[in-house]
Amino acid sequence: MMFFRPVFALLFLACISMGASAETIGPADKTEFQRIIAGQITAFRADDGPAAYDFAAPVIKNIFPSPEIFMAMVKQGYPQVYRPQSYNFAETLLDPTGRPIQNVTIIGPDGKTYTAVYTMEKQPDGAWRIAACTIVEIPGVDA
């Protein structure tokens, strides 16, 4: 199960390196990013794999082809988003390739503070989905 984290990190890097057109992030987009991320965290907390999986972009679903496999990966490699003590939305930015990212400050189940960097991807139907998530521990900051 430990292979999931490197796979997810590689997926994140692959997504960043893909040629993507720059998005313009408006207030409605920011609100939608936060709704999606909060919805997925709520689904994780309820152990509702199908609901959590619905927020994932196709690139994630291609690597983790079922809600059960996806949830196993999240439980093993991303306890901070699977069972956060708390979370707050931080800045919404564009990554170097112009893709929108939503930063989330998380207090993990271990009491440590993390930044979750969510890369968002607009689908052909106009809906936003989570294309990647990278967790970075904030050293020296504990809850």
Language-model segments: which ranges?
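Positively charged n-region of N-terminal signal peptides that target proteins for export
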Residues: 1-6
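Sec/Tat signal peptide C-region and signal peptidase I cleavage site
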Residues: 18-22
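Bacterial N-terminal signal peptides
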Residues: 7-17
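Short solvent-exposed beta->alpha transition segments
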Residues: 24, 34-35, 39, 49-99
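Short helix-capping and inter-helix turn/linker motifs at the boundaries of alpha-helical repeat units
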Residues: 28-32
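Exposed beta-sheet edge and beta->alpha loop/turn motif
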Residues: 91-143
